[in-house]
């Protein structure tokens, strides 16, 4: 009788989990689609890419009803890379004076408009201010829950800021239509999503026009995946399976880069695009990304300092605030969180090299 009772307990758990999932799916289906063409500004051409954050704060809207099971399902999942790099760094953060990375905020809204309004949920971003000029690279670093992804998700208007002001080329970001922003912003995620279609279909997905083979091949060459595709028996007609299961992690990343190149966006969001691949593949992807980032305003989320050393501005986030900011050389010249991360990663790299050398002897 013991085993039937245990199976009954497991069945109850599975049914409860399934019921919660069903409720959340039905809520999602019932949601109204956000208006894509709501906005006063829709320029004929691409944006220049001049982005400015002025005392920006953001908090997620709480769900209308949350029970204990849904709370558990909504708990944030922290990645291994977050723990590997940032855990164990003893650095107490005391909120100090306001950090302004672009000097005087001429034309900013009145102080009342910049104050964080009362919110039923805690703010995940607080008093974020910086400026990114066209073609510059902004790097974001910080541990799990520091607000890196939340910050970049404001740019395509997946969410709107709770307080403060974000401008694109001098116009408030929320005055642009979501369709215009998303047509001109390219995203390469840590785990790119590929559809169960051919490689060619995945590269051309979202372009919105008929794309000749020459353009597809040129994008694949720039992403360093063309030769790999031709090695498959069916070439660009190769079916990749759901989520690209037939491709390696590096191949999926390069297909996503080719897709973004074909879209030719003015603004790029790179969400830790090389954290889940080996060192050799990382070097190949990094080379492809350099071509993708050229003359484009780029935001890079990264955990490895080697990936952000050449950035025009590095923002170190902690608990939704800018803890440090500056170039790599400027941050290395001052004690702080960034220097601790650098020293830790350098020790890890030295230990790895010694292990490799020892195994080869």
Residue ranges and their predicted role:
Residues 31-32, 159:
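Two-component histidine kinase transmitter core
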